[in-house]
Amino acid sequence: GPASYEAPMGEIHGEVASKWQYKIRNGKMIYEFESDVKIDDEILKAELGSNGEVQLKNIIRTIQKEQNAIIRNTKDRIMVIQGAAGSGKTSVALHRIAYLLYHDRQNLKSSNILILSPNGVFSDYISHILPELGEENIKEMSFDLFAYRQLKDTVSDCEDRYDQIERSLNFPDMPSLYKEKQSREFLNRMEGYLTSLEDELMDFHDVEYKSFTKKEEEIIDLFYFKFQDIPLLSRMEAVAENFIDEVETLRDNDMDEEERAIVMEKFMNMYETQDLYVIYSRFLESCGYPGLPHVQLQERKLRYEDVYPVLYMKYRLLRQTSHNGIKHLVVDEMQDYSRLQYLILKMMFPCRMTILGDKAQTMEDEAQDVLGFLPKIFGKEIRRIVMNKSYRNTVEIASYANQLAGITDMD
């Protein structure tokens, strides 16, 4: 297609008819080959640059064509890639990030991308490719670390997935509640409990400040009607701001910070508690589970099975600072995320996503039907892609591995 570049004599325009990769050492051509996309595998580059079989080169070009269509897809908002081991899904996702940064460089910067991955494969690649695009490194972390950072004002520590697995192995007789607390039934019970909090958590009364009064009836009306769309634990703040606006209008001058704090405290004290840890513990007890230990903040540690239910509850009860700065989210190892975790991701990140993984590499006892429930969460915005051809192994090895894993849809 058409292209241009800056030169000392001005901008040069032309047409890119083909792309070639070269390796030259000490004035000697090591290899050269035509390629639609950048290839980083040294063995593959050497093979393509040799006088090898035409069939191999045709196969590689076919692979490139299929993968290139995924890399350059800018139409679908949520792209989900189920890829077998050796199918090239990680390479596709990496090149997709680079392509999107280049294609939409006016609106998308490396700071607008977040990668949730339990390993460093993405950052290793990106640290090499992004300098070529003039970009800084992209933020990458595990979802467990991200969740802990969101909850550090509620607890002092959170168990991660690997610690939870190790605990299960060391104490096999201890019942695991992870699946129960990630289930749809558990979430439905939580939603019912959150609805009941609308009344149970509140103790309404008149508010007086100097010569100004806000009657209980008016507070209730504002709380349950005018501001009903605001999350429960953030709603009274809106009611207080309404009162502050009225006072400032009537006396024709603004409150100072100390006055605002006094008024805000009067309104916020109508909550029986605002402690998310306490609220979740009471919810557990209402469901017949043991409550959380009654300890101070610095001693609070959540088990892994409770981390994401608490995070979900936080996003339902409190108005959150949105992550609008993140315009593209990459989720690696999608097979290890629960339905609840995807619901949280949808709430936290109203942006484009690339989600990838392999159901055969799950850490769970049995593979989840991630491709089945994701459309129910994200709706019609999702595009599912299955890469079931493995290019890493011989036919014999792949066939034997498929038999062991009970996989029938991988070539």
Task: Describe the function of each predicted region.
Residues 1, 134-202, 208-223, 227:
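Conserved P-loop NTPase-based nucleic-acid remodeling module centered on helicase motor cores
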Residues 106-107, 111, 120-136, 141-148, ...:
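Conserved helicase motor core of SF1/SF2 NTP-dependent helicases
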Residues 39-163:
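P-loop NTPase Walker
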Residues 41-48, 292-295, 381-383:
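Short glycine/proline-rich turn/loop motifs
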Residues 187, 191, 196-328, 338-342:
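Conserved helicase NTPase catalytic core signature
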Residues 1-46:
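N-terminal accessory nucleic-acid engagement/regulatory domains that precede
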Residues 115-116, 233, 387:
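Active-site-adjacent beta-strand anchor residues
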